[in-house]
Amino acid sequence: KLGYGGAETGCYDLAHYLPENNCISYLVTSGGQLLKFIDKKKVKLIKLPVHSKNPVLMLFNSIALIFIILLNNISIVHARSRAPAWSCLLATIITRRKFVTTFHGTYNFKNPFKKFYNSVMVRSDLIIAGSNFIFSHINKNYPKYLDLKKKFLVIFRGINVDYFDPSTTLDNEEDRLKSDWEVNKNKKMILMPGRLTAWKGQETFIEALNLVNKELGYESFNAVILGSDQGRDIYSKKI
């Protein structure tokens, strides 16, 4: 699904970048919050249940992707998560198209089956690691899937520098956010953006705030943890 995570926003950004460089862009997704922002004049949107890990639905998605690839003469298929990657792998093998994957995180594996499931992300013609850490993680944990025929490289995450240009920020927009967050306008603000999940470090952030409090006192600053819990109610309540 096209939520607000790094993999999803990267997919969204690339899908809109390609048409600006004389490429036709197709985006296959099951839905999500970013759908309302997609420029349908640039990006051709196709909805399929690609979020599902159900083997029957994954096979259905593969068949649907085969028709989509052939009917639209698609040359390259790029997957960013595991369930859709399996569907894409089968579809690209049958249609003989190039297959690209971006390996965004350290997928957990506690048994051989889970590791095999994860391995689809390194079965492509081109494997993109989002950082040097992920590059090392792949080399360490999935070496048997890497060979000289594959291209394997690091492409760091980027941002839209026009959208995130501080000089374009409006004062009234800042005031509205501070009002929504119920923070004091005259205090310094410490912001922790990111999805609410344990490995993102929100608990460490709170521990760090306690250290800042000892030095400066809570009355000298505001702290905001910003992000979606994506259904992780227990963790958000703990925070």
Where are these regions (language model features)?
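Short donor-sugar binding/catalytic loops of nucleotide-sugar-dependent glycosyltransferases
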Residues: 1-3, 193-197, 212, 228-231
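N-terminal strand-loop element at the rim of the active site
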Residues: 1-5, 10-56, 139, 144-151, ...
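Nucleotide-sugar donor phosphate/pyrophosphate-binding loop at the beta->alpha transition
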Residues: 56-61, 98-100, 105-124, 136-144, ...
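Short His-centered aromatic/hydrophobic patch
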Residues: 79-85, 103
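A short helix/loop element that forms part of the nucleotide-sugar donor recognition site in Leloir-type
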Residues: 165-183, 239
